[in-house]
Every structure is written in structure tokens, then in C-alpha cells.
């Protein structure tokens, strides 16, 4: 599964930073 951001692009949700996906940048 991947998470996509308009400004950041797409990343795997198993990446180390995945926890940020649940928080506003």
C-alpha cells in the first residue's frame, strides 16, 4: 500500500516515516 501527498509524492506506508502520515505536516 502507498500513501500519496500532493507536495511530497507517493511513499510506501511501511517506510520508517509512515507514522507522520497520521499527522499534519
Swiss-Prot record:
One of its GO terms (biological process) is lipid catabolic process. It is found in: Secreted. Its EC number is 3.1.1.3. It catalyses: a triacylglycerol + H2O = a diacylglycerol + a fatty acid + H(+); 1,2,3-tributanoylglycerol + H2O = dibutanoylglycerol + butanoate + H(+); 1,2,3-tri-(9Z-octadecenoyl)-glycerol + H2O = di-(9Z)-octadecenoylglycerol + (9Z)-octadecenoate + H(+); all-trans-retinyl hexadecanoate + H2O = all-trans-retinol + hexadecanoate + H(+). One of its GO terms (molecular function) is all-trans-retinyl-palmitate hydrolase, all-trans-retinol forming activity. The keyword Hydrolase applies. One of its GO terms (cellular component) is extracellular region. The keyword Lipid metabolism applies. Inhibited by bile salts, is reactivated by (pro)colipase/CLPS. It is an enzyme of class 3 (hydrolase). Disulfide bonds join 4-10. Plays an important role in fat metabolism. It preferentially splits the esters of long-chain fatty acids at positions 1 and 3, producing mainly 2-monoacylglycerol and free fatty acids, and shows considerably higher activity against insoluble emulsified substrates than against soluble ones. Belongs to the AB hydrolase superfamily. Lipase family. This is Pancreatic triacylglycerol lipase. It comes from Felis catus (Cat).
Amino acid at each position: 500500500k502507498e500513501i500519496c501527498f500532493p507536495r511530497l509524492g507517493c511513499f510506501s506506508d511501511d517506510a520508517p516515516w509512515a507514522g507522520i502520515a497520521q499527522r499534519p505536516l
